[in-house]
Amino acid sequence: MTTRKSVLREVEEFRLAVELVELGARLQVLESEVAISRDRLTRLYKELRGVSPPKGQLPSSPEWFLTWRPNVHASLFLSAYRFLMAQGKQSRIRCIVSAYRLYVEHISLIGEDLTLSFTRAWTMLRFLDSGTLVSSTCKCCGGSFVRHKYDLQTNFVCGLCAPPPRAAKGKKLATSAEPFVVPEDLQQTISIEPAAMNRPKDAPLRRMGSLKP
């Protein structure tokens, strides 16, 4: 029975490793989350990707998550992750995987380019766990956004409600009044009120998909 359990456990570990590689996880992420040797993970990565795992350190700057566009993307992922964790139905790494898939789905729905890689999303959660990054609620839209722990700004307003001037440089705002409707199940995943998600294309949330900083 023990042998059977160990075999099934190994199968689950490899299945998870395959998912992580397909989502773009770096080798360091795989080593942290999967109980498989580095040598076997390297061979698995090469088999799935056709190339050796990239070398070098993981992204290590929390400041990246504070710039305008990355902050919006990171905050969307974080809201999905926290929603799934609150349900208590999946392990932490499974919540990360599911939240990232939801993030990718949502970004593709609004026609925006992916900004947050899986490895950066995973790294951001480590910054949050260590207290280097925190989240605050925007006083305008009620969404939860990533901030630095030493950011002393009060009455916080997010980058969607008050985008920086450079965000619109060289790009004309969309003027169509056609609403972007978010699926109900996805509305439940992000901590922004549903009414705030179904606003005109030229409203702050739609700007995310119509501007290039």
UniProtKB/Swiss-Prot annotation:
Q: Which residues form the signal peptide?
A: none
Details of cofactor binding? Binds 1 zinc ion per subunit.
Q: Which UniProt keywords apply?
A: Activator, Bacterial flagellum biogenesis, Cytoplasm, DNA-binding, Metal-binding, Transcription, Transcription regulation, Zinc
Q: Where in the cell is it found?
A: Cytoplasm
Q: Which InterPro entries match?
A: FlhC (IPR007944)
Q: Which cofactor does it need?
A: Zn(2+)
Residue positions annotated to bind Zn(2+) are: C138, C141, C158, C161
Q: Name one GO cellular component term.
A: cytoplasm
Its GO biological process annotations read: bacterial-type flagellum organization; positive regulation of DNA-templated transcription; regulation of bacterial-type flagellum assembly
**Keyword Metal-binding part of the UniProt annotation:** yes
Q: From the UniProt record, which GO molecular function terms apply?
A: DNA binding; zinc ion binding
Pfam family name, one: FlhC
Q: Which SUPFAM superfamilies match?
A: FlhC-like
Main location class: cytoplasm
Domain of life (superkingdom): Bacteria
UniProt keyword Transferase present: no
Q: What role does it play?
A: Functions in complex with FlhD as a master transcriptional regulator that regulates transcription of several flagellar and non-flagellar operons by binding to their promoter region. Activates expression of class 2 flagellar genes, including fliA, which is a flagellum-specific sigma factor that turns on the class 3 genes. Also regulates genes whose products function in a variety of physiological pathways.
Q: How does it assemble?
A: Heterohexamer composed of two FlhC and four FlhD subunits. Each FlhC binds a FlhD dimer, forming a heterotrimer, and a hexamer assembles by dimerization of two heterotrimers.
Give the family from UniProt.
Answer: Belongs to the FlhC family.
Q: What is this protein called?
A: Flagellar transcriptional regulator FlhC
